[in-house]
Amino acid sequence: MSQQIKLLVGLANPGPEYAKTRHNAGAWVVEELARVHNVTLKNEPKFFGLTGRIMVHGEDLRLLIPTTFMNLSGKAVAALAKFYQIKPEEIMVAHDELDLPPGIGKFKKGGGHGGHNGLKDIISKQGNNKEFYRLRLGIGHPGHKDKVAGYVLGKAPAKEQECIEAVVDESVRSLDILLKDGLPKAQNRLHTFKAE
C-alpha cells in the first residue's frame, strides 16, 4: 500500500557557514531530491524557507528547508502545512540523528524529539502532534552530552561525510519506495543499508 506523504522537510540551520555541518544532514535529502527531479528550491518568505514541488508517482510532494534557525523549524512547517492543508501524518521530516552511526538511516512514524531542537519545535507548533514521519540520518555521537552542540555544528571528517552522503542517496531511493509501496517495504530497503 502506498504512503501519502505531501510534505518533505529537511532540517537545517541557514547560511553558508552551516551548509556542510552535521546538523544540516536533513536538508541534504531535500536538496538531492530536488536535484534528481531538476527542481530549483525558491526562497518563500511566507513559509520561512526554501520550497519546491515535485511529482512522485502522480502525487504532489512539497519540499521545504526552513531558513529559520533549527530551534524555530516548526514555524516554517506550520506555515506551509496550514496553507496547503497538510496534516501532521502527511509530513516527513529528515533530520540528523546522534543515536545512529554515520552511514545508517531509518524511517520512523511518530515518537518523541530525542533532544533534537528542530523536532521539538515542530511537535510544539503542530499542537503537540507527534504523528509525522521521520527520516533519521545517522551522524554518530561525540561520546559525551557536553560535546553535542559543538559536534552537530561541526563538519564530519571526509570518511564520515562520505558515509552520510551515501545514506542520503539511499534515502532518496528508499523514499520513492515508501511513496509507491508503503513504509514497511521502504524500511526493509533502507534499514538493511550500511555505507562503509
From Swiss-Prot:
It is found in: Cytoplasm. It catalyses: an N-acyl-L-alpha-aminoacyl-tRNA + H2O = an N-acyl-L-amino acid + a tRNA + H(+). InterPro entries: Pept_tRNA_hydro, Pept_tRNA_hydro_CS, Pept_tRNA_hydro_sf. The record marks 13 as: Discriminates between blocked and unblocked aminoacyl-tRNA. GO terms for cellular component: cytoplasm. It holds the Pfam family Pept_tRNA_hydro. Keywords: Cytoplasm, Hydrolase, RNA-binding, tRNA-binding. CDD domains: PTH. One of its GO terms (molecular function) is peptidyl-tRNA hydrolase activity. TRNA binds at residues 18, 69, 71, 117. SUPFAM superfamilies: Peptidyl-tRNA hydrolase-like. PROSITE patterns: PEPT_TRNA_HYDROL_1, PEPT_TRNA_HYDROL_2. Belongs to the PTH family. This is Peptidyl-tRNA hydrolase. It comes from Vibrio atlanticus (strain LGP32). The gene is pth.
